[in-house]
């Protein structure tokens, strides 16, 4: 007979496996974001592809989708280090600001995942640390 703790761990492992295979569902359920069908496909492909390139015109939400993927990846795969490379520092910081201003207010679960004592976003140093 399994203990309650062992049953909880087994259930958590099942949900983690499900959400790792369906990252778009994790974004909707955990971050409380309503994704369009093409965003679901892009998130899924980001997760399963070793190399992913998304070329799109202005206003299609590339930064927003990148922010969603970074957050989902950091939560579902503990101890993941994510580096955002861009042409300028401001463009990279833009992704972190999207996390802070667009994603966190809609998801108390995401807010609880972030270690605010070690996180900072300013002009010279920008980092968001997750508790896991």
How would you label these PLM feature ranges?
Residues 1-132:
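Phosphate/NTP-binding elements of NTP-utilizing enzymes
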């Amino acid at each position: 007979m399994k203990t309650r703790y062992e049953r909880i761990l087994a259930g958590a492992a099942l949900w983690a496996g499900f959400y790792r295979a369906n990252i778009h569902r994790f974004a909707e359920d955990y971050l409380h974001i309503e994704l369009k069908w093409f965003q679901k496909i892009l998130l899924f492909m980001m997760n399963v592809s070793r190399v992913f390139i998304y070329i799109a015109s202005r206003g299609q939400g590339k930064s927003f989708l990148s922010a969603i993927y970074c957050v989902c990846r950091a939560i579902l795969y503990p101890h993941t280090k994510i580096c955002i490379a861009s042409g300028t520092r401001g463009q990279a910081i833009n992704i972190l600001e999207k996390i802070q201003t667009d994603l966190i207010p809609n998801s108390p679960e995401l807010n609880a995942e972030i270690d605010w004592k070690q996180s900072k976003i300013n002009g010279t140093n920008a980092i968001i640390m997750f508790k896991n």
